[in-house]
Amino acid sequence: MISSDAIRGYHDLMLLSLLASGDSYGYALAKAIEQRSGGRYTIRESTLYAVCTRLETQGCIAAYQGRETHGRPRIYYTLTKYGRDLLRARRAEWQELKSVVDAFALPPPKRKKKRSDNS
């Protein structure tokens, strides 16, 4: 299981990436995160909605009411143009960050032994 501390900075990337595929609502986003992570990460409901609220305030996503379920309208989220731009930037940042962390997390390549020139 992945710790929430290790993944905290990537909630934006995960949600923006999911919404790039189409509009969705909170419960479906949480299930998609769990499924795409192979069950290795489950986002808490409070975390999910806090991230959605922050992304909406920043203009990255927009919320709208969908059809009613169990007597309440379901709130859907959609990606804005600014959100698409931010997603591109976050993906590029992730690639750069990953290469830096890999330099420390992965074992270093084995060095070839030098032959001494004793001719």
Task: List the predicted regions and their residue ranges.
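N-terminal helix-turn-helix DNA-binding core of bacterial DNA-binding proteins
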Residues: 2-47
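Short, hydrophobic-biased segments on the C-terminal half of alpha helices
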Residues: 49-53
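Conserved catalytic core of Hanks-type protein kinase domains
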Residues: 18, 54-55
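Beta-hairpin "wing" of winged helix-turn-helix
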Residues: 56-73, 78
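Amphipathic alpha-helical dimerization/coiled-coil segments
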Residues: 85-119
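Accessory beta->alpha helical hairpin/"wing" motif in late/C-terminal subdomains of nucleic-acid enzymes
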Residues: 79-83
